Amino acid sequence: MGLLACEKNLVEANQEWEFSNPKNANLKIVNTYTSNVPAGAPGVGVTRFYSYQNSSKLNGNALSSPGSWPGPTTYASLMPGSSTFNFLLDRRIGNNYGVIARGDTAFKGTITMEAGKYYTMFMIGESPSQSLYLVEDKLTDPQERFYAVRFANLVVSSTPKPIDVYSRRERKKIANNLIYKTVTDFTELALPSVSDTLDVMDAGTTRILYSFNTFVPTSRRIYTFYTYGRTGFAAERLTSYTNR
């Protein structure tokens, strides 16, 4: 009986995680942090983070860049309202928030989320001016044989430049003049018969900066593409995650 009860509780917990609880807020965290300072765990070579809502630890595995939490197509169901979020270096491995050593908190911010809504929290910038950028995800299921997509420009530069995004299958730009720390609305596009290539261009030109090759969207899925990197330090790239 005890084993069955345990399994039942796990199933209920998984259902709450996968399906939205209208009493909670839904959050996805995306790490685009480009600096390798402050240093993380010894010998790791990259800076990774554990995240806390108030004093509650959220992720079991440290989050590196580029990366998202929780898993694909999933949001974390969290307490709504105003909360303090702290992102601590992975050299702190305990579950308890406790007393924080000086320099261990790389990101900190007070975030307000409403019950029943979906959000993405981007970890952006470079040390020592990194910050948290919260965006509401207004998710509407696309029609059959269509998908939805949006774009975010999160490349760090001393002289940020706007970008355009060009779809080779659509043969047109599907995002225009996107400035730093800006996210477009979702756009619904017809499902391509073959894979697409998305080119990031200097705004107003046809000069390709970098591309995302072999994008194969799925019918009725919702995607976010974001640029990341730091001019002159970390290679600039375009990558994506699935909202739903």
What are these model-predicted stretches?
Residues 6-244:
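Intrinsically disordered, low-complexity polar regions and short flexible loop motifs
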